[in-house]
Amino acid sequence: MTVLLFTLIVLVGAFLAGLLGSLTGLGGGVIIIPLLNLGLGVDIHYAIGASIISVIATSSGSAAAYVKEGITNVRIGMFLEIATTASAIVGVIIATYIKADYIVVIFGLILLFSAVMMLRKKVDHSNNEQTSVLANYFKLNGSYPTEDGVKQYAVHRVLGGFAMMFVAGTLSGLLGIGSGALKVIGMDNIMRIPFKVSTTTSNFMIGVTAAASALVYLHKGQIDPMIAMPVTIGVITGATLGAKILIKTKTDKLKVVFAIVVTFLALQMIYNGLSGKA
């Protein structure tokens, strides 16, 4: 395969990954890494390195818009980033010492989990209940704009959410994905933050977490510009288009189809990892 053909395939694949990732809320990494590893035979470490760069780029663009709209809770994001940034570096170090086959299997399992999370019914936790002591101490409670005016919300179980962020950060560094599903669980289910706030705050955090991982991958020489550049351009373009389509389109059926595709990719990666074909 020529360099030009490889670049074109990666560019088109990354565009579709960014488009579908934006429409379904999973991000492009869950598609682009299997494409590079399974489809094009790229070493899993280099596939992860390219994905991390694209995660930084896409998160930075959309995060700025959400912060400007006043939906993102920047204070919660920066507080939880203490856990995710430190653990992301731990994840990258772990990736150095375990076989690529194991990384592929873990990635497949996370894909399965993400597919289930994508179909999960969303619950809004907007509330004015009594908050936790730590939330008051760190001033994490907040508000966000809605069609019915500004809604106040209280933050709960701060330590539980912080612990979940450590797990999410480790997986982000290990696998090169945003681990948005785990971050949303930490903020939505554990800390009981409204879903819209948890998703936008997660998006804000993903770029910072990925940046910490990228520094280590760059130091190890596992970020190849020939792969990372078309991946980043494709994912950003696809994600931008997906965001515009999302406003006008119902994505329930698309999410079901995408969950099936992701499940297939997950099983394929798990099989390859267990059989030593990764």
Show which residues each predicted segment covers.
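Generic transmembrane alpha-helix signature in multi-pass membrane proteins
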Residues: 60-71, 171-172, 183-188, 208-223
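Interfacial segments of multi-pass membrane proteins
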Residues: 32-46, 172-173, 182-197
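Juxtamembrane transmembrane-helix termini in multi-pass membrane transport proteins
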Residues: 24-82
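Membrane-embedded alpha-helical segments of transport systems
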Residues: 53-61, 83-87, 94, 205-212
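Transmembrane alpha-helix interface/packing and boundary motifs in multi-pass membrane proteins
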Residues: 14-25, 62, 165-175
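Short hydrophobic/aromatic, small-residue-rich stretches within specific transmembrane helices
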Residues: 51-55, 202-206, 227-232
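Juxtamembrane transmembrane-helix boundary motif
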Residues: 1-17, 38, 44, 68-169, ...
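Alpha-helical transmembrane segments of multi-pass membrane proteins
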Residues: 9-14, 47-53, 198, 204
